[in-house]
Structure formats: structure tokens, C-alpha cells
Amino acid sequence: MLRHFKYQQTMKILILNGANLNLQGKRDRGVYGCESFDEFIPRLQQKYADLTIDYCQTNIEGEIVTALHQAEGKYDGVLLNAGGYTHTSVVIRDAIAAIDTPVVEIHISNIAAREDFRHTTLIGSVAIGSIVGFGLNSYILGVEALKLHLQ
């Protein structure tokens, strides 16, 4: 009798944060909340101990592009909060479009309920979806979205 074994690899997710997100917990607390990523990421990794969740933050647009390129083949999915680059960066949009790795657009605040210039997202049209407005819980919802997408 033949036995079939399903090889199950641990899902790997990259959380990639852009400009000013190094100030999370300090900047505009009324909009973004008080918890820093130094506090949140270990809590997220503990909640999803069955997954590998790596974290990267940069204020430099080109480094976001490079991280997206390097995610190809290394990660099963990316949660991307590009910060203000969401509204302006054609090169980040093009980097997402150029890779096969699924990307979920994440925003801590509800960008549709903020200033007019924040309503436009260049990234949303090439991401598999967008999760906005749930505070840091947007990242938890993003992990769940990637898990469902990759099933």
C-alpha cells in the first residue's frame, strides 16, 4: 500500500513598513495608537507561532523596492504598509506588480477618512487586497488574509 505524505512547510510572511513607521507609538497617537512595533511584533509572532514572521522597516523608498524584489521566492506573502509612499510611489507599485509574491496593503488608520491626499493609493490596484483602519490589528487581519489566500 502506498502512503502519501503531504509536506507542509512553515508559511513565511514579511511585514514591510515604510516611511515614519519607526515612530509608531510616538507619532500622532490619536491616529495611530500608542503601541510601538517593538512591542507589537513579538506579540504578533507569539500569536502566530506556527508561522515565520519577519519584520523590516525603512524610510527609504528604494529599500522598500529592494525588499519586495528579495521577497520573491523567500516569503509566501508580504504585508506592506508603505506609509506616505502609498500615495506617491510608482516604483513601489511597479515592484509589487513585478513579483509573484502576494502583497496585502496595510494601513493603521482609515486612509479614506483622512485628508484628501491620503485617499489615493497607487499600491491598492496591484495588491491582492487592502486592510485599513483597524489600528495595529490591521496586521493581524493581514496575516489572516494571506493565510486564506494561500490555502
Model-derived features: positions:
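Extreme N-terminal starter segment of soluble prokaryotic enzymes
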Residues: T10-L14
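Short glycine-rich anion-binding loops that position phosphate/pyrophosphate groups of nucleotides
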Residues: A19-L21, G83-T86, S109-I111
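Glycine- and acidic-residue-enriched helix-capping/strand-helix junction motifs
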Residues: L23-D38
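Short beta->alpha junction loops
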Residues: D54-G62
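Short, glycine-/small-residue-rich phosphate/pyrophosphate-handling segment
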Residues: D54-Y55, V104, A113-Q151
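Short acidic active-site motifs
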Residues: E63-A67
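Short acidic/histidine-rich motifs immediately flanking catalytic phosphotransfer sites
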Residues: A71-V78
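Short Gly/Thr/Asp-enriched flexible loops that form oxyanion-binding sites at enzyme active sites
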Residues: S89-D100
